[in-house]
């Protein structure tokens, strides 16, 4: 099994998929190769807004935070499931190498994939108040991205891209070269 991350950031070669996989893998105790990242926007299946896409360093200023937040929520659910399965406290669970285990006791563990299967195949046996499934959606909306004003103007960027080109030229006065 693997973890899938879907983001509405559309990279143009900046390595968004690599960064997203590394963040999620780190939070969930997996290898980045165990994380599949979908970095496309299909308006038939995904909500689109003015804030969707890739511009003005939006990925590092907004999307990375949403990815980390969703991964932390999934990790909390996994720890709750592991605690229930292993009969320990959720705060005593660590996620390492694809397993949820008792901190410092690798032998007392359960594969994360087994916990994910439990949420799907046996939802009646989940801890109280836990919804079936193991997925999260995180939306981060910075305060300065306010609603449209009376003239329907809207701020669409948290940061602004810029480019600075610098050229250093050395000329030998004697030869003009």
Task: Label every model-predicted segment.
Residues 1-28, 40-177:
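Cofactor-centric catalytic regions
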Residues 33-39:
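Generic long, charged, amphipathic alpha-helical segments
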